[in-house]
Amino acid sequence: MIIAIVKASIKDNKHKALREIANILQFEYAPNEEGCEQYESFIDGDTFITIERWRDQAALDIHLEAEHVEKYVPKLRECVVDGCFDVQFINTNDINFARI
């Protein structure tokens, strides 16, 4: 399983536009994407966060090349500082555990 945690700072007066775009991705596209197990976006003050969970890397790769991603990610970039997202990827196959 691949988990992506996406985070960005929202530009002034862009909260509403960002929420509208994020809702399109979360409610219209993500539920129908093969291999998408979770896709939730949150706004906390001036911080935008999306948590994505994908069955495997292949499903995530297909998502990243999807037409709706190419269409809406540039619109999301217009709403965030420097047009950049910080993304942390977690591959559950590569997580090391310690018993303490």
Q: Where are the model-predicted features located?
A:
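Short, surface-exposed ligand-recognition loops at beta-strand->loop->(often short) alpha-helix junctions
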Residues: S9-E20
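Non-catalytic surface loops within mature trypsin-like serine protease
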Residues: I10-D12, D56, N91-N93
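An amphipathic, aromatic/His-enriched active-site/gating alpha helix that lines ligand/cofactor pockets
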Residues: I24, E28-E37, R53-Q88
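Short flexible/disordered coil segments
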Residues: M1-K7, A66-V73, I95-I100
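Glycine-rich beta-strand-turn "strand-cap" elements at beta-sheet edges
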Residues: E40-T47, P74-I100
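Intrinsically disordered, low-complexity acidic/polar segments
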Residues: H15-A17, A59, N96
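Short, well-ordered beta-strand segments in beta-rich or mixed alpha/beta enzyme
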Residues: I2-S9, Q38-E65
